[in-house]
């Protein structure tokens, strides 16, 4: 699982949380690689016989997820800031914008959380997937958003 540890110079580390599940970005790069019928997998899990099912994955597809966050996240950040030009991303093949912290207000898409958009790109290489994801990020017009620039950087040669 994932654990979040807070380290303060004047005290010992404190365990803040321990997650035994994947978060959104992790899930959003695993699910598209599943080639098995997802409904069959869910039904097998419900019936308690998932151990009898072989899950088929596309091992060749490489995926990268870049999370667009509201400036100030994870501390304080503004809600209600408009996000524009999302439709332009549709021109990039094999890229999806997954809304995580958005709302639809007065006919506009606005930020409604800290982690706002997940940009998922797939390609034959991590370098190509990474380039597509950041190309999409650069098309999105959101003054109050930011991304980390190091996502999948170390995986570019794979």
Task: Write out the residue ranges for each language-model feature.
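Conserved active-site and cofactor/substrate-binding residues in soluble primary-metabolism enzymes
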Residues: 13, 25-29, 33-41, 61, ...
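Fold-independent oxyanion-binding glycine-rich loops
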Residues: 1, 17-18, 69-70, 100-102
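Conserved metal-phosphate-binding beta-hairpin within the catalytic cores
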Residues: 1-24
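Structured core elements
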Residues: 14-15, 65-67, 118
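Generic C-terminus detector
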Residues: 103-106, 111-158
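Active-site "cap" helix and flanking loop/linker of ATP-utilizing ligase/carboxylase catalytic domains
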Residues: 19-92
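Generic long, charged, amphipathic alpha-helical segments
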Residues: 79-118
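A glycine-rich phosphate-binding loop feature that marks nucleotide/adenosyl-phosphate handling sites
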Residues: 1-6, 56-67, 150-156
């Amino acid at each position: 699982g994932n654990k979040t540890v807070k380290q303060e110079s004047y005290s010992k580390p404190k365990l803040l949380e321990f997650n035994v599940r994947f978060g959104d970005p992790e899930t959003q790069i695993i699910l598209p690689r599943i080639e098995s019928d997802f409904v069959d997998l869910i039904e097998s899990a419900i019936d308690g016989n998932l151990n009898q099912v072989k899950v088929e994955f596309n091992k060749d597809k490489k995926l990268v997820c870049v999370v667009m966050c509201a400036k100030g996240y994870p501390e304080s950040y503004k809600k209600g800031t408009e996000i524009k030009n999302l439709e332009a991303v549709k021109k990039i093949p094999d890229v999806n914008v997954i809304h995580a912290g958005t709302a639809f207000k007065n006919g506009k898409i606005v930020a409604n959380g800290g982690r706002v958009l997940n940009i998922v790109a797939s390609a034959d290489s991590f370098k190509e997937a990474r380039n597509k994801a950041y190309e999409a990020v650069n098309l999105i017009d959101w003054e109050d958003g930011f991304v980390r620039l190091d996502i999948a950087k170390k995986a570019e040669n794979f």
